[in-house]
């Protein structure tokens, strides 16, 4: 349900349906395996659909038995639909979408896809509308604490009572910013590093953007999961059924574009090394808007980053 909810939030998936393998027993059933999802994508009046098998893994390598993939492909051919694999390695925390035909032989009976191969062929941007964001390094939150009362010496330092004297959000130049949309806050929170400055009468704790890259889908995960306790899980079905309660993916993109230079450095729309043949002719995905890609694109064309 997590992947389906993320597809709907990204905005280009106009319909997603969870399929079931619960059918009457039949000898022909051994020929097919029903994938997890059927999804329809619509962009600028063009429509594309696909069957999607959803997988997660602890490590950065995904393996399939050849017979299993053959049954998935057989069902897809029966339905005259392309077959895709959605994969989330738990170590990285985001979803990749790819055609399983890129898999490499592992043994006589199995194939495998490593993270690098999957990332180069990722369709989440061009098909589903995901994009990469690089928050401006140094933008973030600053908490200033002042000591009240005397210090009590301890074996490895001292103990004292502090209180917050100031707290605010600031841009990459350190300028205090009070009118910042929630979407920018969630974006920064999805790519943080922690800094501390300690002095005699207090200390400063800052949570600032590291300069690393995040993705729209990870900003969503941060927004809906930030207030949960460690043992709590995100209720993705509720998220998918109540998208109006969450910032929109297009709204996040607009807010990021409008704060270029202060809070944002780059926005990338990823293009796979090979455009899938099942996509309609002229399918280009999300259009870039000026310097939101880090440069002014000629004739308004989309800036892509090849995997």
Residue ranges and their predicted role:
Residues 253-307:
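Hydrophobic, glycine-enriched assembly/anchoring segments
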Residues 7, 35-59:
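Conserved catalytic cores of phosphodiester-cleaving nucleases, focusing on short active-site segments
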Residues 2, 58-59, 104:
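Short, surface-exposed beta-strand-loop junctions and turns on beta-sheet-rich folds
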Residues 98-276:
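Long, charge-rich C-terminal accessory regions
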Residues 56-81:
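Mg2+/Mn2+-dependent nuclease catalytic core
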Residues 73-103:
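Nucleic-acid nuclease catalytic cores
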Residues 1-23, 78, 128-144:
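Acidic-basic catalytic patches of nuclease active cores, encompassing PD-(D/E)XK
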Residues 17-45, 146-149:
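Active-site metal-binding core of divalent-cation-utilizing nuclease and nuclease-like domains
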């Amino acid at each position: 349900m997590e992947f389906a909810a993320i597809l709907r939030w990204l905005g280009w998936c106009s319909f997603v349906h969870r399929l079931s393998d619960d059918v009457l027993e039949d000898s022909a059933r051994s020929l097919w395996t029903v994938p997890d999802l059927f999804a329809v994508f619509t962009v600028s009046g063009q429509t594309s659909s696909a069957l999607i098998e959803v997988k997660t893994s602890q490590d950065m390598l995904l393996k399939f038995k050849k017979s299993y993939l053959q049954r998935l492909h057989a069902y897809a051919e029966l339905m005259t639909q392309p077959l895709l694999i959605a994969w989330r390695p738990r170590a990285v925390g985001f979803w990749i979408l790819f055609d399983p035909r890129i898999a490499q032989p592992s043994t006589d009976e199995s194939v495998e896809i490593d993270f690098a191969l999957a990332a180069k062929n990722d369709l989440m941007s061009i098909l589903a509308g995901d994009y990469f964001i690089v928050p401006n390094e140094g933008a973030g939150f600053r908490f200033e604490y002042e000591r009240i009362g005397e210090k009590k010496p301890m074996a490895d330092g001292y103990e004292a009572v502090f209180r917050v004297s100031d707290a605010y959000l600031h841009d990459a130049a350190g300028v205090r910013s009070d009118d910042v949309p929630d979407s920018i806050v969630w974006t920064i929170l999805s790519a943080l590093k922690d800094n501390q400055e300690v002095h005699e009468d207090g200390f400063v704790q800052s949570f600032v953007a590291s300069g690393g890259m995040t993705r729209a889908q990870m900003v969503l995960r941060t927004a809906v999961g930030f207030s949960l306790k460690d043992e709590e899980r995100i209720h993705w079905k509720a998220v998918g059924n109540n998208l109006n309660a969450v910032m929109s993916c297009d709204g996040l993109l607009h807010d990021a574009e409008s704060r270029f230079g202060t809070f944002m450095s780059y926005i990338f729309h990823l293009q796979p090394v090979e455009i899938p043949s099942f996509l309609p002719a002229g399918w280009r995905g999300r259009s870039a808007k000026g310097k939101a890609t880090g440069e002014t694109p000629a004739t308004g064309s989309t800036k892509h980053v090849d995997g």
